[in-house]
Amino acid sequence: MANSLRGEVLTLYKNLLYLGRDYPKGADYFKRRLKNVFLKNKDVEDPEKIKELIARGEFVMKELEALYFLRKYRAMKQRYYSDTKV
């Protein structure tokens, strides 16, 4: 694996690990799944395939950020708007 791709993969792993701290099923669950996925693909050497996997990881990262944003929004909405009808 080229050094530039290796750096991208490590950065992606660290970012996903950081985002996994607030995962709904728990940080340990997320960390275990993340490690398994990265270990499953550790033998991939084709640069194009590695770039595909990096793109998929970045997509997952964006989805997690959206999930956390929505969770915070829902909590805020529940605090300020009651569901009781007049």
From Swiss-Prot:
InterPro entries: Complex1_LYR_dom (IPR008011), Complex1_LYR_ETFRF1_LYRM5 (IPR045296), ETFRF1 (IPR052000)
Keyword Mitochondrion belongs to the record: yes
GO molecular function: enzyme inhibitor activity
Coiled coil start-end: none
Pfam family, one: Complex1_LYR
Subcellular location: Mitochondrion
GO biological process, one term: respiratory electron transport chain
Signal peptide per UniProt: none
Sorted UniProt keywords: Mitochondrion
GO cellular component: mitochondrion
Location (main, coarse): mitochondrion
Keyword Iron: no
Family membership: Belongs to the complex I LYR family.
Assembly information from the UniProt record: homotetramer. Interacts with NDUFAB1. Interacts with ETFA. Interacts with ETFB.
Its biological purpose: Acts as a regulator of the electron transfer flavoprotein by promoting the removal of flavin from the ETF holoenzyme (composed of ETFA and ETFB).
Protein name: Electron transfer flavoprotein regulatory factor 1
Source organism (scientific name): Mus musculus (Mouse)
The organism's taxonomic lineage, starting at the top: Eukaryota, Metazoa, Chordata, Craniata, Vertebrata
